[in-house]
Amino acid sequence: LNAALLFLFNSQQIEATAYLQHMESVAKAFVFDRFLAENVGADYFDIIYTNGGVCQTKRHNQNQSIMVNALKPRLTFGHIANNLVFNFLDYLLWINHRAAEPIKSYEFTFRSSVEHYYPQNPSGSNMRIEPDTLNSFGNLCLISHEKNSRLSNRLPQEKKGFYQDNSPDSVKQHLMMQFATWDAQAIDEHGKAMVAVLIDCLDAAPHC
C-alpha cells in the first residue's frame, strides 16, 4: 500500500498503465530482493524509497542451473518466506494463459494455505513419496484454508475430480491438474517449469 500511495503522490498525471507497471515492478522486487534473496533480504523501505520499486536482482548472463540451485532451498515447504511468491507466480502464469478457459475467467482471491498436491499423509494404504520431492515447489500450490482442510489427505485424482465442478484456487494448481499422473517425475517437471517462469521474468518487459 505504501508503494502504491507513494507512486500516486509523486505522479503529476495518473495513468493506469504506468501505475500497473510500477506495481508489477514493486511485486517483483519484493519477491526477488526480499523473499527469495540469497542472503539477508532488502528492507521494505529500501525497496520502495531507495530503489524506487525497481528490482535489483538481475539475471544477466547467469547460468540457468546456477540460479535454479540457488532458489531451490527458498522454494521448499517451510522455507518460502511469504505467500507473495505464489501470488506473483500466479500473476505471471495468468498473463501467459489468460486467453483460454478456465484461466480467462479466473479471479484472484485471498488464499492463505500452502497445499501439498500429493498429500503429506495420503488416506488409506496409499504410498508416501520421498520427502524432498513431497516438499518441493513442484508439489506446492496456494489454496484457501477451508479447501486445504477438506482436501488435504485426498490423492491428486480425487482433488482433480473436486475441481471439475469448482474453479481452481490458483493458476499453478490448474496447471498441476493437467498432468494425467501426478508422481515424482511430474512434480519435478512442473517444478522446473515454474522456477523457469520466475527466472525468465527478470529479463521480461512489464506485462501491463
Where does each model-flagged region fall?
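Flexible coil/loop and intrinsically disordered segments
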Residues: 1-208
